[in-house]
Amino acid sequence: MTGLQLSREELLKAYRLMRMIRVFEDRVSAEMASGDIPGNTHLYAGQEASAVGICLHLSESDRIASTHRGHGHCIAKGCDVDGMMAEIFGKDTGICRGKGGSMHIADLSKGMLGANGIVGGAPPIACGAALTSQILGRNDVSVAFTGDGGINQGTTAESMNLAQVWKLPVIFAVEDNGFGEATASSFVVAGEITKRAEALGMAFAKVDGVDFFAVHEAAGEAVERARRGEGPTLLHIETPRYYGHFSGDPDNYRTAEEKAAMRRDRDCLPRFRRRVTEAKLLGLDELDKVDAEVQAAIDQAVASARSAPQPALSSLTTDVYVRY
Amino acid sequence: MAQKSFRQALNEALHHEMRRDPNVIVLGEDVAGGSGASGQKDAWGGAFGVTKGLLGAFGPSRVRDTPITESAFVGAAAGAAMTGLRPVAEIMFVDFLGVCFDQIFNQAAKFRYMFGGKAVTPLVIRATYGAGTRSASQHSQALYPIFTHVPGLKVVIPSSPYDAKGLLIQAIRDNDPVIFLENKVLYDTVGEVPDGAYTVPFGEAHIVREGGDATIVALGRMVHFAREAAEILAAEGIDCTVLDPRTTSPLDEDTLLEMAEETGRVVIVDEANPRCGMAADISSIIAEKAFGALKAPIMKVTAPHTPVPYAPNLEAAYIPDAKRIADAVRKAVAFKRS
Amino acid sequence: MSDRIQAITMPKWGMTMTEGKLAGWLAGEGADIAAGQEIMEVETEKITNVVESQGQGRLRRIVVSEGATAPVGALLAVLATEDVSDSDVEAFIASYADRAGSAAADADDAPKARIVQAGAHRFKVLSLGSGGVPAVLIHGFGGDGGTWLFNQDTLAQNRAVHVIDLPAHGDSEPTVASGKVTDIADAVLELFAALDIEKAHLIGHSLGGAVALAIAETSPQRVQSLSLIAPAGIGAEISANYIDGFLAAERRKPMKDVLSLLFADPQGMNAEMVENVLRFKRLDGVPEALAAIAGHLMADGKQIIDLRAILDGKIPALIVWGEADQIIPASQSDGLPAGVDVARLAGAGHMPMMEEAAQVNRLITAHLGKAEG
């Protein structure tokens, strides 16, 4: 498997990011229960290999556009975890000054064009970023994260067509976690997702989203294709979704057995640990050390978010326009 | 100074700005004139000929015909704006913004606020609006109140060739998303337009005509009818100010209030439907902030609360005209408190 | 036309005027009118101004009443001596050929401004009249040829009169990058060559006065006379409020406030006038060009060019100043050498050629005649 040719540093980085996402989401879930997080969140736990497997190929000048379930993409693209946590707590130190919340975390300086509250929101934006790269003659690519819900949106269909006719350097990363809110994708998605790309003459791949290395390899090919000017790729990435649609979702549309099996059999983190230790690329002690560091970082992020000030009331009316 | 058509004024603005800034691009349906066909290049230059000649001057990378998928290309324009370009997207009819409204009011309009002030979205969306061409309900609306309602958007409605050019250049140079609406009946109207580039600032009403008896507020094509009404009334000894706000967001409240206070009578003409329209909005501002100066109730002359009809007699009855405006002014002037 | 009976007609102020509104009669029927007496107020889209009677006599009949609009050239009233009978007045009105106005007929052969290439410069020039020693009219900072709306026609009765837009003003391109008065003067001299002007009467207002002085400094042989109206360049004081305010104003309200400083009585200003100045200032390149000129004209609120020594009495010079000038004080006309004629006009601000047009026209006409004689 080619992913195993990654350097130790890259492997450690991938593991750290995946672990960071998992711990971040588990902690947000716990903090939600405490009642101190004012808004709603949609947790990415279980899907970490997808975000990290793709974003590891990207530099800061590459762009991604994300979904309502965006924390994982943000962390994988390099957003500041303290700022993200503060944002979710609605604080002035938040990455969006407390104005966006979980669903609108963005950091343009990191090439993160925003989580998005609208299903199917990302594909047109990612096409736009790719258009910028193409017109300005840059080598940057962009990634539209969407899901088995978003694949049915008109925006996604329109964007895939536009990307293909204009040969835009964009990757449509369709994270299929099996559910659009509470409705199973098997109930609402007709046909095969990859066939939608095939019909447009677009390159595609279907990958196991629990396997970091599989995602990383498929994404690598897609990114290289885009950088070569050969246009877009659709990646159909099958992942689990550990939590319900939103934090606090009783998730009673799935059986307890199904959920337990999912967490037992489809977890990207132990699978990654097993693979790298069996191949003797990293030691368990190194991985455990990362776990401890990540835990400390998240503890710190929560502590600083809790103690941070609320936004000033005067900021209610600022930053609507550059100039009005 | 040279006389130019409204269409030519817009075309010059696009030429100026594409020359001035390589980040300016134009995209939309048939803006490059109809690509991929066997006949002449740049045959259409946009559905209304506004983008004619851009393809030849700036090439197919910066002047792009799109699929008929407004969500994709307006959304892409928003994404491109956020990442460094200055896209000018053309939507043939403002009515079609219905199929990509999410891209405008959930995405482009809100990037800056949602992202804590870090995003800049210099996007222009040009579209035609207005009744009078027998185009019926889905190609004739005056939807600017809808966009005016959305924080984060700027909304521009030029009434003259001079304003069309200066406001479009301002829109392209502006760092916020701008909805730029062109009344299709005005494309062949002619007026003085400088050859060089210039800007007309947003939020600055134009005093088209000065008179002490009443203020007629009008936008876009209605400015012409308001002038016509003012001429009719002048012959009767009623002197009207005609005020063209030029942009509904930002709105030049200061000048509206100043003129309302100076004349004490206000008639607002709006081609849009009456409920939650610009006439209603402006009248509420004046009623709230200049009530003491009013000598008569604020009069509204608007389209009825109906879709735009097709039959010529019905359409003519739908659109406000000089006669209805003059009648409203006379009524205001004749008003006596009992 | 007999001197016993004379027509008062709608004046034509500038090329674009086709009609005017009779805003008010300043004398009633039966009043005796002296030549030069203010007789009526006329309003156009651009400006409102009083009109002085050219002739004298009794105001026998008002033909166009207050509030009515009439085309350029239309008969507005009749002046006649006492001995003219009412029936003769009626006959005069009935037969007045131009009663309907001449604007429509004149539209085609009206003089048109042209763009004149002069070296690297492209000047807008409007020329009227012919013969004599030509006069060149040079407007002030931020102005244009429209400054001379009430003057060019009268001055062109017996000579060619060229109204020019300075570089970066009106319809002339911003070809003087430095903004230095001396460079502007050199550009105007290049225009002289392009127009085949050997020698001219220079009539300059404000900054245009300084430009005229700068031309006289380097090329006295090209200057028949100087008529300087509230000129810059002969004293230190200048209103920084005006210059800075003019540079800063981007919108109607602040621009209106700034422009009102120009006039003793700003009532004659209207929205169109303010709009036209804003239109000029919005052109790409103009704000920078104006700032460059201002930067060479003044520093720390004082004028920094001193051309006062040019007024040494060798070149015939007339200085006209409004007593109520709020931009450059009229006191700067004190203490000039003998041989420099000074006229200070009460009731005028920085724009006497507009506010007291007839008086300024008389002064300049007399001065030019004297300078040629």
Which sequence ranges carry the predicted segments?
Chain C
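Active-site loop/oxyanion-hole signature of alpha/beta-hydrolase fold enzymes
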Residues: 118, 162-203, 207, 362
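Catalytic histidine-centered segment of alpha/beta-hydrolase-like enzymes
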Residues: 348-361
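Conserved alpha/beta-hydrolase catalytic His-Asp/Glu region
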Residues: 249-311
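Conserved loop-alpha-helix segment in the C-terminal half of the alpha/beta-hydrolase fold
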Residues: 313-348
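Mobile cofactor-carrier "swinging-arm" domains
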Residues: 1-114, 118, 123
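Flexible "cap/lid" loop of the alpha/beta hydrolase fold
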Residues: 213-217, 224-255
